[in-house]
Amino acid sequence: MQCALYDAGRCRSCQWITQSVNEQLSAKTADLHRLLAGLPVEQWCAPISGPEQHFRNKAKMVVSGSVEKPLFGMLHRDGTPVDLCACPLYPASFAPVFSALKPFIARAGLTPYNVARKRGELKYLLLTESQFDGGMMLRFVLRSETKLTQLRAALPWLRAQLPQLRVITANIQPVHMAIMEGETEIYLTDQQALAERFNDVPLWIRPQSFFQTNPTVASRLYATARDWVGQLPVRHMWDLFCGVGGFGLHCATPQMQLTGIEIAPEAIACAKQSAAELGLTRLHFQALDSTQFATAQGETPDLVLVNPPRRGIGKPLCDYLAQMAPRFIIYSSCNAQTMAQDIRHLPNYRIQRVQLFDMFPHTAHYEVLTLLCRL
């Protein structure tokens, strides 16, 4: 992939950009083999990759500069701003949004936040696009509610310029720290969730719910999990750290009992909406801590699917799963190092199948799906 920002030395986020996609896949595969060394793997499935550019469905832009000439991108450690509007990871559909937002910021009087001076209001712009219908969600991350009235008054102009903006919010992040969002979300549109669809499964994206940033590869990840579960005798399943329900909604059948657990209420609202659309009445999604939920249960499902954050599921949940001993565990991980550590805490399971998904091209990161079977 060619990137003018990288060539000019202005951005180094894609550290592997000089390697071919095949070289990147080989290096990631070797890393996964190294991490699972000593753990017998029955089947290594071929890695899955997607487009090398224009694949991201989300932009997270630091706003700097002035209200008349805002700049969207990032700040170097010395405070130097870098404009990332031309980043080749973004689809072409993002460019007109960025172009319209620059004069809009002046119209709304949203002074960019100055980190050094601790002054200003607009900290970040968070833009998400649905691959299903091209609809977009835009979040203005503000220091306070001071400019809300002005923002609301200026919105009709922006929506006339960009009718694809279906969900618009103001997120309030008052602290002087590099934190992307605060707890308060104020909706500026009637619509509160963005419609998405993977493999004919309806999914919803809300402002404070996690959603994969590479929809092409994510849809193949969910489809693969569905295929694996479909080959197993599963009537009762847990989907832990379930997010908006992507895995569970793909794997569920009308006859299957499935419980999805995720700590974020916004994500659970999305999952419940999807389950209702699919007419799956035996799916139950709850906003709880996954480890606390699992360790409080007295029943044992046939399969437990886990999709934890980078820290992994941790030893307490590993110990409980080892004791509870479901017949199957599917582990989806964005950090193979912590996944390998967790699997070593499950000595009564063998690895039947492993597949790497190149969710993050041009970086060392990748997603991996692993099927564990009880000995």
Swiss-Prot record:
Active site: 334
Protein residues bound to [4Fe-4S] cluster: 3, 11, 14, 87
Gene3D superfamilies in UniProt: 2.40.50.1070, Vaccinia Virus protein VP39 (3.40.50.150)
Residues engaged in binding S-adenosyl-L-methionine: 212, 241, 262, 307
A biological-process GO annotation: rRNA base methylation
Swiss-Prot/TrEMBL catalytic activity: uridine(747) in 23S rRNA + S-adenosyl-L-methionine = 5-methyluridine(747) in 23S rRNA + S-adenosyl-L-homocysteine + H(+)
Top-level enzyme category: transferase
Key words, A-Z: 4Fe-4S, Iron, Iron-sulfur, Metal-binding, Methyltransferase, rRNA processing, S-adenosyl-L-methionine, Transferase
E.C. no: 2.1.1.189
SUPFAM superfamilies the UniProt entry points to: S-adenosyl-L-methionine-dependent methyltransferases
Pfam family for this entry, one: tRNA_U5-meth_tr
Molecular-function annotations in GO: 4 iron, 4 sulfur cluster binding; iron ion binding; rRNA (uridine-C5-)-methyltransferase activity
HAMAP family xref list: 23SrRNA_methyltr_RlmC
Family: Belongs to the class I-like SAM-binding methyltransferase superfamily. RNA M5U methyltransferase family. RlmC subfamily.
Function comment: Catalyzes the formation of 5-methyl-uridine at position 747 (m5U747) in 23S rRNA.
NCBIfam families according to UniProt: meth_trns_rumB (TIGR02085)
UniProt xrefs under PANTHER family: RNA M5U METHYLTRANSFERASE, TRNA (URACIL(54)-C(5))-METHYLTRANSFERASE
Protein name according to UniProt: 23S rRNA (uracil(747)-C(5))-methyltransferase RlmC
The gene coding this protein: rlmC
